[in-house]
Regions:
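Bacterial Sec-dependent N-terminal signal peptides
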Residues: 1-25
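Acidic helix-start/capping segments at beta-turn-to-alpha-helix junctions
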Residues: 86-105, 141-142, 209
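Beta-lactamase-like hydrolase cores
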Residues: 19-62, 239
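Structured C-terminal helix/loop/strand segments within mature extracytoplasmic catalytic/sensor domains
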Residues: 23-33, 139-140, 144, 191-219, ...
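Conserved catalytic neighborhood of penicillin-recognizing serine enzymes
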Residues: 97-135
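Mid-domain, small-residue-enriched loop/turn segments at the edges of structured enzyme/sensor domains
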Residues: 40, 135-197
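Active-site SXXK
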Residues: 62-92, 125, 265
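Soluble periplasmic/extracytoplasmic beta-strand elements of cell-envelope proteins
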Residues: 42-46, 54, 70, 91, ...
Length: 299
């Protein structure tokens, strides 16, 4: 047998072993970061669409506003089925701009009685995590049931979207009803990047909106500042529950490196007893470790 052919066959045989060892090393590093933290922390990383690393994935994590990404996909599907573009105008009454919730949309248009496009509303939800814009989109596109049903149609199962932002605001315990495992959310992002879910104009709009996200700069994006990496992400932030714990501090996104490597990363932190700053720092530390590992170790 030709020596080069033999070496090639041997390489194919040992490559899975090398890959397993490398991903095991990353998992150990991530476990080291979260050890001793006063919170339930779940992590999922998908490298180049293939190798997967998870930590504490078998738990229901409240998504908080990360579910607005799920909603955006369902809105795109709704628009395609109805023959609507994201330029389609939506009339918004003053009563829909609730005063007791986070809403840059309401702050800009406090009197309501305005018309904005579906795309503008999606920018408010994906860029700024606007709660009123989210519930307006739910109202116009079939509610949480439609979003839940659409995501399930993609083959995603370990999640649930049952309540609106207004319902969560009225009952903090309802936040736990919109949940997901980290890996299921990572799979959704992978689908957005690699599959033709709907028309390219819808798909590009959502990925571009994730890249220009303005929230959570102290989380996944923080250690990537000053690098040439491109990150798109969606954050989620909860209030404190009756025990004084932060219900959810989350970030879910994708990173494209200059060397052509790509990875999806999701970090969900549930019931944190740490400070808000320290909880966000955990996500940043995880992001830094994954970035360093993939950009330098996997050559």
């Amino acid at each position: 047998m030709n020596i080069n052919k033999l070496l090639f066959i041997l390489w194919l045989l040992i490559l899975p072993v090398i890959t397993l060892a490398e991903t095991s090393s990353l998992k150990e590093q991530l476990q080291g970061i979260i050890g001793g933290k006063k919170a339930q922390i779940g992590i999922a990383v998908i490298i180049n669409g293939k190798d997967t690393v998870t930590v504490n994935n078998d738990c229901r994590y409240p998504m908080m506003s990360v579910f607005k990404l799920h909603q955006a996909l369902a809105v795109a599907d709704y628009c395609q089925r109805k023959g609507l573009s994201f330029d389609t105008s939506v009339h918004i009454d003053r009563a829909e701009l609730k005063t007791d919730t986070y809403s840059p949309l309401r702050d800009k248009y406090p009197q309501g009685n305005i018309a904005l496009s579906i795309g503008e509303l999606l920018k408010y939800t994906l860029h700024l995590s606007d709660n009123n814009a989210c519930d307006i989109l739910f109202d116009r596109t079939g509610g949480t049931e439609t979003t839940d049903k659409y995501i399930r149609s993609l083959g995603i199962g370990h999640f649930s979207i049952e309540v609106t932002e207004d319902e969560m605001h009225k009952d903090l315990n309802a936040c736990y009803r919109n949940w997901s495992t980290p890996l299921e959310t990572a799979k959704i992002i992978e689908m957005l990047l690699t599959q033709e879910l709907f028309g390219k104009e819808y798909q590009n709009f959502i990925t571009d909106a994730m890249i220009t996200c303005q929230t959570g700069k102290d989380r996944l994006a923080y250690p990537l500042e000053g690098t040439n990496a491109i990150i798109g992400h969606k954050t989620g932030t909860g209030d404190r529950n009756s025990k004084g714990q932060i219900i959810g501090t989350n970030d879910a996104g994708f990173v494209c490196l200059p060397n052509g490597k790509r990875y999806t990363i999701v970090v969900f932190i549930k019931d944190s007893e740490e400070t808000e700053q320290a909880t966000s720092r955990i996500i940043a530390d995880i992001s830094e470790t994954v970035y360093r590992y993939i950009s330098t170790s996997l050559q």
